[in-house]
Amino acid sequence: MAAAPKDIEKPHVGDSASVHRIRITLTSRNVRSLENVCRDLINGAKNQNLRVKGPVRMPTKTLRITTRKTPCGEGSKTWDRFQMRIHKRIIDLHSPSEIVKKITSINIEPGVEVEVTIAN
């Protein structure tokens, strides 16, 4: 007795209300301003009853430059050490893209870069 395969119909969701996976990447040199923007984004998403994952704290990149203090090369060999730390956070949202436009319209502090990636 072999069972015949059944055709299963999946309900079609319209493109206007389709739910996307949206990844918001925040980078900054200032940790305090970065955390403030993360908190504002997450609070706005939770007010809209969206599914939120994050903020995921990525490893801090430390850029270092070591250079001689004297331009002519004479004298004792003294060195200057400069460094810049870049902090990164990732927030994942599951929502329609129209709602994300409302959420990302918050005041973003200077020095914080925002990158929004939409995937299906």
From Swiss-Prot:
Entry keyword set:
Phosphoprotein, Ribonucleoprotein, Ribosomal protein
InterPro entries annotated for this entry? Ribosomal_uS10 (IPR001848), Ribosomal_uS10_CS (IPR018268), Ribosomal_uS10_dom (IPR027486), Ribosomal_uS10_dom_sf (IPR036838), Ribosomal_uS10_euk/arc (IPR005729)
PROSITE patterns per the UniProt record, alphabetical:
RIBOSOMAL_S10 (PS00361)
Phosphoserine: which positions carry it? S16, S18
Protein family membership? Belongs to the universal ribosomal protein uS10 family.
Q: In terms of domain of life, where is this protein from?
A: Eukaryota
Q: Name one GO biological process term.
A: translation
Q: Does the keyword Ribosomal protein apply?
A: yes
Alphabetical list of NCBIfam families matching this protein: uS10_euk_arch (TIGR01046)
Which cellular components does GO assign to this protein? cytosolic ribosome; cytosolic small ribosomal subunit; small ribosomal subunit
> Know the name of this protein?
Small ribosomal subunit protein uS10
Among Gene3D superfamilies, the record links this protein to: Ribosomal protein S10 domain (3.30.70.600)
Q: In which tissues is it expressed?
A: Expressed ubiquitously in embryos, highest expression is in the midgut.
Q: What HAMAP family has UniProt attached to this entry?
A: Ribosomal_uS10
Question: Annotated Gene Ontology MF terms?
Answer: RNA binding; structural constituent of ribosome
